[in-house]
Amino acid sequence: MRGIILKDLYEGFCIKKNLINWLASMIFTSALTAISEFMRGAYGFLLIVVLLFPVMGSTLLQMTVEQDEKAEFDRIQLTYPLSKSEIVLSKYLGGLIVQGGMTLYSFVFVLIYVYGYRTITLEDALPTWGIGVVGGVIYFAVSYVAYFWLGNLKGVIFTFLAMVGLVIAFLLSVFNIGLEEIMQVEKSIWISGCLVMAAVLMVISYFLSLKIYTKKHS
């Protein structure tokens, strides 16, 4: 399992194209918050911490599926002394490592918005960040099933449509409900409910992906 995890992490961060994508995304986001007053405000905080970085954490599988399809690695790894459940589990563990890394990177931005831009207080920022963390895990669970089921090309289309849908939902929430009202919502209730949902969805996601993978390679 460790070999597959390391292979996936290598493909995600050491292949030039993927590394450039990661660096470009992070540098662009950092630069945008530095030069744009809008992005330094509460809207930018919500967009980055609750939506953008949590969703970026689940992109490792897309990168590895793309490489695996090119090299037909799915067939090769079936010859390893690993069960199909261990192969699928290794994909999830590698993805969760990246998800955890993006969670920490997102927390750095929380500190920047609190102590640098002084956009939000730490008391309000931490629960909001928590919602982003849990929301990212929920998106992770859904997107991993999508990539195991659809493959790389259709999976990319799914990711694009999902991102468009999430951005539209974010904008509608902000402008229909109001930014102040959203920030004042009792976030502990959201986090508690979403934690349970995330845990359940992650378990369901793993077993669905395992079933899909087993059916494809039976």
What is the role of each PLM region?
Residues 1-71, 90-218:
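Hydrophobic alpha-helical transmembrane segments of membrane proteins
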Residues 74-75:
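Long, low-complexity intrinsically disordered regions
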Residues 78-84:
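Short helix-to-coil transition segments within interhelical loops
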Residues 86-88:
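Alpha-helix N-cap/helix-start motif at helix boundaries, enriched for small hydrophobics
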